[in-house]
Amino acid sequence: MGTQKEKKSVFALLKSNSIGGILLMLATALALIMANSPGHYLYSMLITTPVEVRFGPLEIAKPLLLWINDGLMAGFFFLVGLELKREIFEGGLSQRSNIILPAIGALGGMVVPSCIYLAFNYQDPVALRGWAIPAATDIAFALGILSLLGSRVPTSLKILLTTLAIFDDIGAILIIACFYTNDIYLPGLLIALLCMLILFIVNRCKVERTTVYIFIGSIMWIAMLKSGVHATLAGVILAMFIPMYSRKHPGQSPLKNLEHDLQGTATFIILPIFAFANSGINLTNISMDFFTHAVPMGIALGLFIGKPLGIISFLWVGVQLRLTKLPVDLNWSTVTGMSALAGIGFTMSLFVGSLAFDQAITGLIFDERLGIIMGSLFSGLLGYLLLNKTLPGDKHEM
């Protein structure tokens, strides 16, 4: 499975994503330590620090946490959009034969976890807002675990996990756009649409300076922030207008250059900061009722059981119907281990959770982050153990 060009594009991301996964673990551990230390109030003060930006009459005032979730994550989704466009033009999504297998797996990996969550929470209208939380996959974390197995991991398995996560990202983008949009403020939406039109015109005029696109995209981000449509979507939309190829410099790609420049920033700065700001749960006053509440239980079981069950069952049906087939060097045992790793929702699940629930309101009843961390932790452990047992080569001792 996969051409040489496709393998090269995947390996270009593997090293940074693997290290990024380790950084995410460290950022999460640091947040939990700070949130449960005698100086836990310093952590709370930090993420709730008010930050205000003014441009003449325009004012944007938010706590630091929301600047991270709405601002920094827009940069992350911009990178996701760039990766999607590149994959569509010349990567793993450019050939139909390479699309069907991960697309079917990703569909199952979103549908079944969501159904498990709904089975726990269908009677609670507030809890229902979290149905999409276990549908996400954190590719950086998953690749970080996969990297622990070294050269034993076949290339086709890395490509399958990466492309499956790409489809997961597409699903997350659509879910955010359709289900987590607040009341619409029409003037803001119209300005955002005008920015999209200008971006289209600039692209058609063959403008290659990425700073022009980013300037217009920044205005679009502000407009979407005010419009009620989640501002992170501005990053994805902006990426679609970045030129793939350069007419002035044949062989150069403005999109690839920008993607290369942003990869390290997203992996080593944006995602660790997001994880640190969103995973600091104070466990000192949490009772067992918080762990057994239907929301965290639905999330944890959706990630731990629903993800691998959904991916494997949908892939099996797809293979039986001859819609697709497994790569020759993979078997159902290794694919099961990979499917368990896909249950590491972490940063993406935390992000969807921040859209679904307001901790100031629901925090006294349940904390969805408990389910995300538990489900992701057990999924990572299960995936590692399964792959360590089924992959050829020397087995790693725990």
Curated annotation (Swiss-Prot):
Lipid bilayer topology: Multi-pass membrane protein
Catalytic activity: Na(+)(in) + 2 H(+)(out) = Na(+)(out) + 2 H(+)(in)
Domain of life: Bacteria
GO terms under cellular component: plasma membrane
GO function terms (MF aspect): sodium:proton antiporter activity
UniProt keyword annotation of Disulfide bond present: no
InterPro entries: Na/H_antiporter_dom_sf, NhaA
Membrane-spanning segments: 19-39, 64-84, 99-119, 130-150, 159-179, 182-202, 222-242, 266-286, 299-319, 337-357, 370-390
Pfam families according to UniProt: Na_H_antiport_1 (PF06965)
Gene Ontology biological-process entries: regulation of pH
Location(s), subcellular: Cell inner membrane
Keyword Membrane assigned: yes
Keywords (A to Z) from UniProt: Antiport, Cell inner membrane, Cell membrane, Ion transport, Membrane, Sodium, Sodium transport, Transmembrane, Transmembrane helix, Transport
General function of this protein: Na(+)/H(+) antiporter that extrudes sodium in exchange for external protons.
PANTHER family named in the record: NA(+)_H(+) ANTIPORTER NHAA, SODIUM ION/PROTON ANTIPORTER NHAA-RELATED
Family: Belongs to the NhaA Na(+)/H(+) (TC 2.A.33) antiporter family.
Designated name of the protein: Na(+)/H(+) antiporter NhaA
Native species: Desulfotalea psychrophila (strain LSv54 / DSM 12343)
